[in-house]
């Protein structure tokens, strides 16, 4: 409901189709009867479908409903604001060492709760071998399957082939786990100062370091 619905005495119709507190259908009743039931249940009569004939009204705690709706909307905006799409570029004939390096970056991004756009760049005669890019994307998706899933299947995009991986964990969960791990390392460093004097400072530097720009293989 985008606009404020009419509630209780603001409802001005002779009869309504009433829905009970648990979602049960009460049926069409006079408005006076619906208001009487609302008082008996110590709830509000809320018009949830004004354009229906007769209008549909439900018995509910409107204050609680508004609060829960606001919290859900706030959480949705929070998760949306944290959504980041990283990008990793690979060549179809990438060597094993470079592949492992790029895969490591993808793993890190997924652990952080970020989506990753994988771009396979074809050059020259490589463009006649799209299956090379497809197999490479399949291999990468399988290698990181425990951390992410294929959100957008491999597809051609001009001379490139792209695929999007999504994280299994929400961004907020990943950030919370990262903070907990960092605090645990700091506590360990304090308990064992001889082990690593600068452990806590190193963690802070790593946490604040910006993600590196995507590099070509």
Curated annotation (Swiss-Prot):
The keyword Cytoplasm applies. GO terms for molecular function: ribosome binding; translation initiation factor activity. InterPro entries: T_IF-3_C_sf, T_IF-3_N_sf, Translation_initiation_fac_3, Translation_initiation_fac_3_C, Translation_initiation_fac_3_N. SUPFAM superfamilies: Translation initiation factor IF3, C-terminal domain, Translation initiation factor IF3, N-terminal domain. Keywords: Cytoplasm, Initiation factor, Protein biosynthesis. GO terms for cellular component: cytosol. Coiled coil: none annotated. It comes from the Bacteria. Gene3D superfamilies: Translation initiation factor 3 (IF-3), C-terminal domain, Translation initiation factor 3 (IF-3), N-terminal domain. NCBIfam families: infC (TIGR00168). Belongs to the IF-3 family. Monomer. This is Translation initiation factor IF-3.
């Amino acid at each position: 409901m985008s606009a404020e619905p009419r509630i209780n005495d603001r409802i001005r119709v002779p009869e309504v189709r009433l829905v009970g507190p648990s979602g049960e259908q009460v049926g069409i009743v006079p408005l006076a009867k619906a208001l009487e039931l609302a008082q008996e249940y110590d709830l509000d009569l809320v018009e949830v479908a004004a354009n229906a004939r007769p209008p549909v009204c439900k018995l509910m705690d409107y204050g609680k409903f508004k609060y829960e709706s606001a919290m859900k909307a706030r959480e949705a905006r929070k998760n949306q604001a944290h959504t980041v799409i990283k990008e990793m570029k690979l060549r179809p004939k990438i060597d094993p060492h470079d592949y492992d390096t790029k895969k490591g970056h993808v793993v890190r991004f997924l652990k952080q709760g970020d989506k990753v756009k994988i771009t396979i760049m074809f050059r020259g005669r490589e463009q006649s071998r799209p299956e090379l890019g497809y197999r490479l994307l399949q291999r990468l998706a399988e290698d990181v399957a425990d951390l992410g899933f294929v959100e957008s299947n491999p597809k051609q995009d001009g001379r490139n082939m792209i695929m999007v991986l999504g994280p299994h964990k929400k961004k907020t969960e990943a950030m919370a786990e990262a903070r907990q791990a960092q605090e645990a390392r700091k506590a360990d460093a304090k308990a064992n100062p001889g082990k690593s004097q600068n452990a806590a400072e190193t963690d802070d530097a790593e946490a604040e370091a910006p993600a590196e720009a995507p590099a070509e293989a």
